[in-house]
Structure formats: structure tokens, C-alpha cells
Amino acid sequence: MSEQIQIDTGAFQRRVNKLLSCWKDSSADFEQLNQVDSLLVVMGGQNDDLIYSKTTAIHSWLLGYEFPSTVILFTKDSVTFVTSASKAVHLEPLKRSSTGFNLEILKRSKDEASNRALWDDLVSRIDAQGSKVGCLPKDKPIGKFADEWQSVFEKAQSSKDFKMIDVSASLSAVWATKDDDEIKAIRYASKMSSAVMSGYFENEMSTILDEGKKVTHEQLSERIEGKLDDTKLWKRVKGLEGADLSLADWCYTPIVQSGGEYDLKTSAVSSTKRLQGADGNGGVVIASMGIKYRNYCSNIGRTYLIDPHNSQQKMYAFLHEIQTQLADKHLRAGATCKEIYSKAVEIVRAKDEKLVASFVKNVGFGIGLEFRDSAYVLSAKNNRALQRDMVVNLSVGFQDLDDPNHKGEVYSLLLIDTLRINDNAPATFLTDRVRGTNDMSFFFKDDEEEEEEEERRSPAKPDGKVTPGGKVLRNKNRGAAHDDTAAEKMKLHQKELAKQKQEDGLARFAGEDGEGNASNEKVFKKFESYKRENLLPTKVADLKIMVDHRAQSIILPIYGYAVPFHINTLKNVSKSDEGEYTYLRLNFVTPGQIAGKKEDVPFDDPDATFVRSMSYRSSDSSRFTELFREITELRKSATKREAEEKELADVVEQDKLILTKSRAYTLPEVFPRPAMEGKRVPGDLTIHQNGLRFSSPLRPDQKIDLLFSNMKHLFFQPCDKELIVIVHIHLKSPIMIGKRKAKDIQFYREASDVQFDETGNRKRKYRSGDEDEIELEQEERRRRSQLNKEFKVFAERIAEASEGRVSVDVPYRELGFNGVPFRTNVLLQPTTDCLVHLTDPPFLVITLTDVEIVHLERVQFGLQSFDMVFVFSDFSRAPMHVTSIPTTSLDDVKQWLDSVDICVTEGAVNLNWGAIMKTVNEDPYDFFAEGGWGFLQSGSDDGGSSESESGSEFGSEMDDGQEETDEDSDSGSDFGDSAEDESGSEGFEDESEEGEDWDELERKAARADEKKRRQQGGSDDDEDSGKKGKRR
């Protein structure tokens, strides 16, 4: 374990300097720190009973780890560690990076005399600074090390008259504002907390109540705790890319409460009573949980209403309104904790004075390395001000309200989220916020029970403002409460999704480092011709111009020295003849050139001195001609190699396939796509320990290995209404098959055999009618059914062998619609997680979780088709266009997209997506701050392109914008290989080259016919009109 410890020296440097800077700050937040001459932090042995303390927090903040049995002494210009020799090994690298302060490490040993001398040295250092010593009195170190130091320091304290001052509150202020790394850790923790709450607890709790299982609060809490190790859960969570899940842990044991006994404090525990709420009279379940990542905490709490009374729903909606107002209007940098709580009380008092007594005594606290930072409690007595980039745990609730469903009993409501404080903008939710309290209600009553209950009640005038909703289990429909039409519900849902996208965008790009543009920044590349001088060719002694193909360099003689220049530093070379001399001029890439954007490359030090050009002359014309040819060819080969490397940059080198030693499952006689080199031959697909292997006995030298770790999606497409049955695998990263890279690999078998007409044979002689045709049809149906069964079982075995990495997804043909994703009009079919076309290459696989927003273009009355644009969350990828979708499919497409929680907008014209995405990538945060994707819904009718008349304008629009794309391609505005990202059809590039679509060809044909008709004087009007209206 010790070998794995790596301290972030940069973070240590920044944070020590921040501490020393705050020490010198005279503001009220650092009042105690200003009073002391030195700061002493003592960590004793491991104390499992003490989870959170200022001592462990300062260790985690500075070092990223806890160093037991260690003393840290801070002065205003130095840091001193006293620790064991084994721990000192990990601290030594910090000495090399310490600037602005001195760093010393005193190493303890087993020699008591030398240890005593260390203690005396430390006491003298404290005494030299002054008598006022900052300390953390609430932290009580334990163990032999702590006892030894304590005895030494108590004696010194009596003789030196040291005055101990508690600086806990000041330290809280020092690390209250979080840097980007800390925010990232808390965001990971918050995502995980939200995932457990919504992805597991909701379903588990509702199932327990629905099926009447007898499970206690404590048992359910233990189940929740066990989900931390559930890798399947985390694979489904978006936003955890790059997170090391081994660094996650629970902040506290999850809390579950129900049945009229509720404690809204953070110290509450789950009782041994059973989960209640499904007794027919309703109930309230409160759950709170928090996960920490790299010791940075998060927290989330929710209340679930079971068959709630109308007054309970209204009260929960009011609590949600309180949280929304605090987050959107009052949680800002500069506001004091006291002001926040006062605003919350004002909102409650305005609703009902009596509710103030039931309202919580504080509305949250600062959260981070400590789960509850006592210096930043949002209560009525705390005058500390919030700061930008602080993270708070906002907790609002009502305690012990009268339960209308159970006379004489009470219920409580609680809503907790983790938020980041901004300057002049609403606080950012790091946990998934509650959009509406209707989704937090569960209904178990039958319609008949509800009708009987309504009959018993006195008739009352219905409240038109109450929004129906809630989760209904086992199809127990509450249809009488649903007044909104499907279209209105979709519109409301889309508004919520759009608002969520806007907030997520602001949160995602709020960091000062411009997080979103990191992938587009140009990277300085260092080229090295020769590592040592003795590696230069021996011929350089002749001081002649040389071209070294092996080192990819040109060696030029300059003032008696042989100077190598890497070929990538060369811009161009020219040769000219003047009189009896031949001139060779070499121009190099340098900063500040007035040149094309391809030369706009970064430099290690732009202010250094550069050689811009070199000219040589010689009377040996043939020699310079040969040099010019060699340099030109070397430059061409370097450019070609660079292009190939860029093309294959995303291709991964897979690990070795581990062959299974036992009997392996095999799918025989299948064909691969893309096909391997040579003639098409069938082969066997076999499941091994960590992946699949396709091999053919006819070509033993060729095989395809696919590892489970590189699989992203697994599809099974039956042969119903198709000619082939397919098992299709979409990879995370492309692999090489032969000389082509592929991201989509499929294995198929043809569904129909060649049939022979048996007319005139013996069997036909004794049969009449269509018995043969009927028998053939029945045989084909049996064959298709058998093929479907065989391929489906094999796909399920792949999913089982992958141990949860992939699951089998089947396209829903009934939800399919026609469109043109590349050049051909094909059937596109939704699956659970994707939109796919798998029947013919080029394949299309769009992962829905990667989609940011979908925009429908050319949606206007009178047109027969529309276009669909998928914008991806990774803005560096080009949007994916699917054109010429029949207008008859518009409502079905919108309903499908809405059902998978994708934000949908629509407009009447085609947009210039190259320019739009360039703007987004330049400053994503500014884009979202100015409204984000809202312009697509409100302003798309006004922008950019002319209206279409009969077909898609996308093809012609791309042609018109091609010059701009070429010019801007090197400025960071061009995208990655989006077609390769979305489909593994690289092997079929010859089938999917750019060209005009049918609509464009028809328009050209129509114009040609019109021109011909005019020349002939209108004699063929009728015929031309017929041709013009004809569609393919």
C-alpha cells in the first residue's frame, strides 16, 4: 500500500501558500489565526471512533492521505513535519516543489535519546516564534506517540508559558472555498449518492411496500450500504467517467425512517421497526444517505409519500418551493448563514405562522472534507458569510406535523441536496434535484377503494391548481386525476428537461479552467532528432547538407557545426537557379508568421529565438536537385504518417484473449462484417474467458478477437421481416480488422436457403394445389424460428459471460422509422439504450446517454419529410444528421425521444451546425449563461437558412459550407471522426462517400426538365410536370 502513495506536490504547494496567505489576512473569518504565532497539528494513532476532525481534514487537504503519528508545525514562513522514517520517504518529494516557504522533515527513530532531541528541537522552534500557539483542542490524539509528545509539551508549556488558542473556525474558512479538483471529487460523490437514491432505493422501497415484504429500516439500510460495491449500478450512471470507485466510501450509515417516528438530525439512526406505509392508510418514508469520494463528502435526503392525503402533497410542494427559492435567489456568495436561515423562516411565516414551530432549526451546513463543518451552519446565530465555490448541504424540513391519515400520529418532511455556491447566479445542484414532488408520491390503492373513500367524504369543490401525478404501481391507475392531454404532458416534460440541461451545462462548465475546451486545446509536441551527439551520422564531418531518413531529420552545416532539424519543424523547401548557382531555401515553422491556420501551432517558448529560414547556394546543380527531391519526399512521408496516426489515434491495442480450457459455447457457420480479407468464408464465433473469438477453419491465419472490456453495446436482431439474423457488437474503441479499423462488428447468418422448383417430379405428380408452396413456407418459418432462438441464446450467453459489462438489446421494429443517416434511406430502430441500423453497412449506433439534445429541422406544414440532428454531450463531436424522415413519423419520433428523457426542439429550417458548435466550443459556459439551447426552440425560425420546399436541404447546405469547414479545420472548430464514433462502418467507406441525396438529384432533374420545356416552347408541359412530381 505504501508504494501506491503519491502526494500531489502541486496541490500541496498551492494549499500551504493559501494557508499562509490567510494567516496574514486581517478579515474576521481568520480572526483566531491572526492572533497566533505558530500552528500545531498533532495526529496520534488511528482512531476508528473519530470519523471527522479538523486534524484528519488538514492532512487530507494538504497531503491527500492521513499520516498517523505525525506532528505538523506551521509558522508564517515554514512547515515542519515530525514523523517516522518510513513516512518521511513519501514527504521528501515535497521539498523540491516548496516555494514561498521552507519545508523541513524531522525523522523519528527507535533511539529514545534522538527522539528526545527531536522534541526539544520542535519546542524550541515553537518558542522562537512566540508564546501564542494555535491548536485544535476538540481533537484528542491517542496512542503512544501522542502520549510521548503530550508529556514533553506539558512540561515545556509550564516553563515557557505557551498560550493555546483554538483556530478551528479559521481553518474552516481557509478550505471553505474549493478548487477545481475538490469540486470534481464532490461532484463524483454527489452523482453516486443520487444514483443510489434514485437508481436503487426508490425501486427497492416501492417493491417492499407493494409486495408486503417484512423488512426493517435497519435491514434496508444495510442493503443500501451494500450497493457501494455493485459495479453494475455504477456502469449505468452517467458522469462517473474517470472516477476511481475504490476511493468512494459512505459518509455515514444510510438512514431510513417511517411509521410516525422521525428524527431529522444528521445523527439519526435506522430503527429495527419494519418499513411502513402500505397498510391502505398511507404513510411517509424518509431516507438520507451520503457518499464521499477522496474523503470529500456529499449528502442527499428525500421524502416519499405513500397514498398521501391532499394536504400532505401540498405541504411537500411547499417544502420544495422553500428549497427552490433558497437555492435560486438567496444562496449566493456574500450572503451570511444567518440571512439564509432568516429568508427561509420568512417564507414559512408568510405561508402559516404556526408552521415556524415545526420548521428545522437550521437549513444546512458547509460540507467537504468534514461532513458537517460547524463554522458554516446555516442557522439564526451564525454571522459568517458564504463564499464563491463553497459547497453546502442544503437541508429543509418540517418536524412532527399532524398526520391526516392517522389520527393522533405525526409525520415529517425532509429534503436534502448538495449545492455549489456561485457569485451572482443561482446555486448549482451537484446532486440530482427534485423537479416536482408528484414524482415522490406512490399510490397503492385500487380505484374501487378510492371511489368508496370519496363517497364517504363530504363533497368538495375540486382545486383546479392541483397537479396530478405520482408513481402508480401494478397499473393501479388513478385516471380520474389525470386531466392533462398527452401533448400537454410532453410539453411540460420537455420544459423540465430543457431546464435540467441548462442547469447541468452551467454546472459542467462552471470551472475557471474552461473544462469544456480542454480537448480542443492545441498541445505542444516536442520532436527530438538525436538524443546524444554521438548518434549523428559519421558523414556530418564533411559539413554537407544531409537527409537522414532514419532520424526523420535534415542536417545543415551552420558556422562549422552540423545542426539537425526535425522534418516536422520544416514549413517548406524551394529550389531556384540563378546564373551558374543553384539556391536551396528552407523555411521553418516559427511563431508570429502571417500564414494559414495550419501553422498556428503552439510553441514551448514563443519568446525564444527561432531560425525562420536558411538559404544555401552551390554550383553543383544536380546535388541540390537530389537534395530537394529527398527533402520533399521526406516531408510528404512525414505528413502521410502523421495523417495515418491521427486516423488510427482512437484504435486500441486489446489485451490478450484468455482461451477457455473447458467446453466453450460456439455459434457455428456465421459470417463477419466487416469481412476479412479475401473471399467471404463462414466461421465459428466462440465465447472465451474474457471475450469472443471468430475463426474460420478455411483461413486459420485470420481471426477476430473481441474483449468484453471493450464492448459497449450488444444487439440481437431477429430475422423477422429480414434476410439475415444478427448478433452485433458496438465497441468502446475501434480495433483493426485487416488494414481497416472498425467500431461495429457483427456476425450473421442468412435466413433463407435457395429453393428449387420440383415441378414434374414424382412428388408433384400425386399432389394438387399449392401443397409444395405451403410446405416450403412452413419450413422457412421453422428455420427462421430456429435461427432466432439459436442467436438469441448465444447473445444471452455472451452477456452472462461478460459478468454484467454488456446486456442484450433488441431493436423495437414497431417503433422504427425511415431516414437517411448516410446516403441510403434505411429503417432506423430504437432499442433500450440506442438508435440503430444494423441490417446493411454502413451501420448506425447512436448511444442515447451520449446525446445532449435532438433538434428536428424542416418541421412545417406541407412538407413530406423532416430532418433530425443529434447533438452530443461531447461538443467536440460533430452532430449526427438523419435526413428525409417521413412527416407521418413525426409524432412517433417525438414521443419516443420524450419517453427516453431526451430534450427535443424543432424548427422550420436547416441550421449551420458547424458554426453553432464552433461557438459552443469556444466558450461553453458563456453559451449556457446566455441561454444555452433555448434559441433552438425560440429563434430557429429566424435564423440562417432558406426554407425547404420539397426535400432535405441538408446536403446542399453542407456543400455550401464546405469551404468554410476547410478553412477552419485547423483552428479547433472541426470535429473528431463522428461517423466513426457513431458507427463502426470504417470498413465500408467506399459505400458511404459524400454525394448528393435523392432530393437534390430530383431538384436538378426538375430544373433540367424545365429548361428543356422552355426551349421546346412548352410542348411537353404535361410530361415534364409528371416527371417533376414523381418521387423515388
UniProtKB/Swiss-Prot annotation:
Gene name of the record: SPT16
Function: Component of the FACT complex, a general chromatin factor that acts to reorganize nucleosomes. The FACT complex is involved in multiple processes that require DNA as a template such as mRNA elongation, DNA replication and DNA repair. During transcription elongation the FACT complex acts as a histone chaperone that both destabilizes and restores nucleosomal structure.
InterPro entries with a match to the protein in the record: Creatin/AminoP/Spt16_N (IPR029149), Creatinase/aminopeptidase-like (IPR036005), FACT-SPT16_Nlobe (IPR029148), Fact-SPT16_PH (IPR056595), FACT_SPT16_C (IPR048969), FACT_SPT16_M (IPR013953), Pept_M24 (IPR000994), PH-like_dom_sf (IPR011993)
Example GO molecular function: nucleosome binding
Protein name: FACT complex subunit SPT16
SMART domains: FACT-Spt16_Nlob (SM01285), Rtt106 (SM01287), SPT16 (SM01286)
Chain segments annotated as coiled-coil in the UniProt record: 633-653, 778-803, 996-1017
Species, as recorded: Mycosarcoma maydis
Family, similarity comment: Belongs to the peptidase M24 family. SPT16 subfamily.
